[in-house]
Amino acid sequence: MAGSFAQLARAADKARDTMLVPKTALETPPLEIHTLGADALRQPAQRIGKVNDQVRELARDMLRSMYTAKGIGLAAPQVAVYQQLLVIDLDLENAATPPLVLINPEITAASAGLDTYEEGCLSIPGVYLDVVRPTAIELSYRDEMGRPRKMKADGLMARCIQHEMDHLNGVLFVDRVTDQAGLQKELKENGFQSKHVQSVS
């Protein structure tokens, strides 16, 4: 029995390692990250029925593209793949820290307390504005091996998860900005058009 347990433990460690890719910029990232104005960003994502090698390779390509763009989170619709898949890494400086892969994530609870914090997005480069979101959340999801998981998150992790999950519904952080004057200014200065914002605030 001990041997079986050890085998399971080694298998779990190996599974975590499958998502470790170099946290360095590539000359040519494997996936194109679409920007504000692209139809891809407004398409809802579908649940993933089976977590297989194809899904894991997509997650790795998303990570490679995210690291190249120096981001901390990326959702599949940002690369024109309409599946419920997110990758997040808040520790870009530590090569040994595995990223978080969330498949079919669902927020099951959110704090009544709200927090205001500046957000940016790889799909809207150069634009940084305050967004109000719940301070803490609880969620369920499947990991890169298809196993059901639950987690609690607060602070930056909670914000990042909520931001990336918005992408799965075709919502961008600029849609939640309440400072319209600041939004117009930031968009104009960075070459984006306000007509592509779909306010949900």
From Swiss-Prot:
Q: Report the EC number(s), separated by commas if there are several.
A: 3.5.1.88
Q: State where Fe cation binds.
A: 121, 163, 167
Catalytic residues at: 164
Query: Is Iron among the key words of this record?
Result: yes
Q: Where are the transmembrane segments?
A: none
The record describes how the cofactor is bound as: Binds 1 Fe(2+) ion.
Superkingdom to which the source organism belongs: Bacteria
Q: Is the Transferase keyword given for this protein?
A: no
Q: Which UniProt keywords apply?
A: Hydrolase, Iron, Metal-binding, Protein biosynthesis
What Pfam families does its record include? Pep_deformylase
Cofactor needs: Fe(2+)
What does this protein's UniProt record list under function? Removes the formyl group from the N-terminal Met of newly synthesized proteins. Requires at least a dipeptide for an efficient rate of reaction. N-terminal L-methionine is a prerequisite for activity but the enzyme has broad specificity at other positions.
- Protein name listed in UniProt: Peptide deformylase
Species assigned in the record: Synechococcus sp. (strain CC9902)
Name the gene behind this protein: def
